[in-house]
Structures are given as structure tokens and as C-alpha cells.
Amino acid sequence: MESSPLLQLPAARVEALSLSGLSAIPPEYVRPADERAGLGDAFDLARTHANDHTAPRIPVVDISPFLDSSSQQQQRDECVEAVRAAAADWGVMHIAGHGIPAELMDRLRAAGTAFFALPVQDKEAYANDPAAGRLQGYGSRLATNTCGQREWEDYLFHLVHPDGLADHALWPAYPPDYIAATRDFGRRTRDLASTLLAILSMGLLGTDRGDALEKALTTTTTRTAADDDLLLQLKINYYPRCPQPELAVGVEAHTDVSALSFILHNGVPGLQVLHGARWVTARHEPGTIIVHVGDALEILSNGRYTSVLHRGLVNREAVRISWVVFCEPPPDSVLLHPLPELVTEGHPARFTPRTFKQHLDRKLFKKKQQHKAKAEEEDGGNGDHHRHEPPPQTN
């Protein structure tokens, strides 16, 4: 079949590809053979997982004892242990009792869904330009990844906290509630991050050290107004219907560079996490927020908490949308290293000190080198014409 002019555009959005009616995905979206064994339609895999009573389930943890002043110490202790175990064994959990109103989460989802329902040409008014250093805005993962292939997703990406640093001119003007709902969700997620970091700190060092992790993430080597708070970045992932989900991924397997990542979604399955040697499909747990442990927290915990390897699958039936808030330390002014109390003769430091930006740069460089080596291997040792710039972000 002759390609349409749309499919020949170098920067065609994945949504436009999906709406074009193509029956086979372009070759640049086909994953390598060694990745495809576990891929498939996300709905089919979710149904299979739901019917498999031996399949492990991502833990669901209620943290309401830390938001309820009338809770008992035993309840808080049990909560600390449940969060600690989930972060250590899984690196991911569903958080219930988080205190963010269901009405606000519904508003956030409605606003993001309305933005992506706009025609592609309208969304292009918010297009980013990673090549020019403008990462915030509407985009597609057009840069190649570890294997050199593209991912089946479009996205909207921007800073949400601190609010004073956010450029609201880059945020969608439509729908009208987008800015208000997103700002409110950002404020509340910042509070949730503090609560969860306190619980995770207690799981490492005891109930009198609940401030350890947040201090480590915000204690700076310089003192400017922008340097003493966590940064929260929002990425709305839009995974269009895919005619060949057994060949593609929405997001390839990766760990997040953040300290924590908070995830909402529209109820369509797609998230998988690696537990042991098995890919586990996340179930829909209404009212909860999914939380990932990221690289920064794994470093601070000296590996006691696990940065979870995960990926996003696609399907033929429905669009999947997810809202991910990445909670990160300031990029240049905080030195990440294992907490001193967790480094002993029997448990030496597993990570060398680095800033968040240095960690991100190392990770991008490693991915670029992996892609280059693979390209050269496939090209008989001369892979110069396969070189690509790394993606604007690894999450």
C-alpha cells in the first residue's frame, strides 16, 4: 500500500498515524525481536493476569494513618512497614488514603483528556522543540531510544511545582479548567510527596528520622530561592490505539530518574512492572495513586529501596492516557549519595556522589552508547549513519 503524505512527514504525531487507518505500524516503531516475546495487547494481558490467581499483585497501601490525627501509633507503625516492604520488594505501590480529593483527580483527568481531544493542528500550538532545548510542551518521542526505535505515544510535559517557577503561558488555555485543576493537583501532590518521603525515611531509620530523605533531596550546596524545594514535572502520556500492539510499546522498559513518581490514568490498562523475572500488569485500583520509587531514592537508600523497571503497553481497543508527576531534587545544587547511616563496613556505598543532572546525563550517555554499540553490531562494525541524539528525558 502506498504511504499517505501524512505518514511521510518526519514529525508525524503518533495520534495522526493511528487515525490514518493504517493496518501495519511503520518499521521505526517495531521493537527488536528480543523485546517482543512479552508484548501484546494490553487488554488481553490484563485479562489474562486477572484470571491468573497465582500472579503477584502490586501492593495496595493505605497511608491514611499519617493524615488522621486520631490514628494510633500501631496503625502508623504498620503503615511504615507496609510502605517500606513495597518500596524494597517492588519499588511500586498503589497508595490509598492519600488525601487528594477524588473530585480533583477527576478534574485533572477531564482537563487532560479534553486537551488531547483537540485536533492535532490545535495541539501543535503548544509544540516543544527538544533540539532547541525547549522540552516543555506538546511532543512525541521522536528521538530514538536504547534500541533505536520509536515509541507509540504523544505527550504534554511541563513543570507544575514550585508554582512560581512554572511558565503558565506554556500550559493549554483549553479547556478553561486545565490551569486551575493542574495547579491545585500540583500543590497537593507536593504535600503528598512530603508525607510519603517521611514514611519511607522512617522505614529506613526509625520513627524519629522522618525528615531524612526530604532533607537529603533539598539540602543544597548553594542557597538561592529556586534551590531549596523539590521540583514536580507533569507528563501526560497519550497512547493512541495501535493496530499491532504485539510489535510496539508506548514507553520502553526503563527506570525513572526521579525520587518518586505519582501516576493517575484513565482506567485503560498498559502499565507493567518487572517483579523478579516476571512482567506484572498493574490492576486498576479505583481511588488510588500509583507511586514508583525512582533512581534518586534508590541512591539515597543505598539500594534498600528499588527503582522499579517498568514499561507502557498499547492496545487495539482504546486510547490510554496517564498523568505522571515526577518528584525531583534541584538539578545542580543537591549532591545525591547514600545516607551516611546506611553505609557500613558490611554495606558499603553502592553509588558515587552525583548531582541529579549528572545522574541524568550519565544515564542518557549510557543509553546513547548502548544504541551506538547495537547499531554498529548490526552494521558490521560501522554504525556512523545510525547515530541519533538521546531523548529529552528518560522517564
Curated annotation (Swiss-Prot):
Pfam families: 2OG-FeII_Oxy (PF03171), DIOX_N (PF14226). GO terms for biological process: anthocyanin-containing compound biosynthetic process. Residues 382-395 have a biased composition (Basic and acidic residues). GO terms for molecular function: 2-oxoglutarate-dependent dioxygenase activity; L-ascorbic acid binding; leucocyanidin oxygenase activity; metal ion binding. Residues 360-395 are annotated as: Disordered. InterPro entries: DIOX_N (IPR026992), IPNS-like_FE2OG_OXY (IPR044861), IPNS-like_sf (IPR027443), Iron_ascorbate_oxido_reductase (IPR050231), Oxoglu/Fe-dep_dioxygenase_dom (IPR005123). Its cofactor is Fe cation; L-ascorbate. Coiled coil: none annotated. Its EC number is 1.14.20.4. It is an enzyme of class 1 (oxidoreductase). It comes from the Eukaryota. Oxidation of leucoanthocyanidins into anthocyanidins. PANTHER family: 2-OXOGLUTARATE (2OG) AND FE(II)-DEPENDENT OXYGENASE SUPERFAMILY PROTEIN-RELATED. This is Leucoanthocyanidin dioxygenase. It comes from Zea mays.
